[in-house]
Amino acid sequence: MSAAAGKTLADYKAPYPKPTSRQRRYVILLDPKGDNAELNDYKVELIPGRVKLLDGANHYFLGGKIEEKTIDGWGYPYYVVTLAEMAGTAMLPLGNAAHKKLRFVPLHTSSLYRYNSKLPIVVYVPKDGVLRYRIWTAKLSGRGKAKSIKAKEM
């Protein structure tokens, strides 16, 4: 069982803002990896987006941004996501992929953030959005790997 599995945001006793009526708050609790490893070998990629009914051929993405803010007097970071409407698509021919299905459409750009198991990663996403994330690790061979995970709304 993960060391972070039983924790909640309240355990950190920090005054994170409540989500507005137009937001969802996601909290990512990370497993300890050791201070040196967390600083040098691990990163977190935040992947906000929306689930939309779309064809299966094209590659869609959203405009928007992730803004880092800080809890006054605490120095703890949190992130606020703004999602725009559909920013673009590859416009591939449809053929057999014309059938529409629900697909995750990510924010056009993504960034890597510090892996720090001592603090939660708190992300506010528009009500119609969802958050996914990846944990990136550096391997001695020089080839990194990532695992995509759905974030938990709290």
From Swiss-Prot:
Signal sequence bounds: none
SUPFAM superfamilies: Ecotin, trypsin inhibitor (SSF49772)
One GO molecular-function entry: serine-type endopeptidase inhibitor activity
Pfam families named among the record's database cross-references: Ecotin
Native source species: Leishmania braziliensis
Family statement drawn from the similarity comment of this UniProt entry: Belongs to the protease inhibitor I11 (ecotin) family.
Top-rank lineage group of the source organism: Eukaryota
Protein name per its UniProtKB record: Ecotin-like protein 2
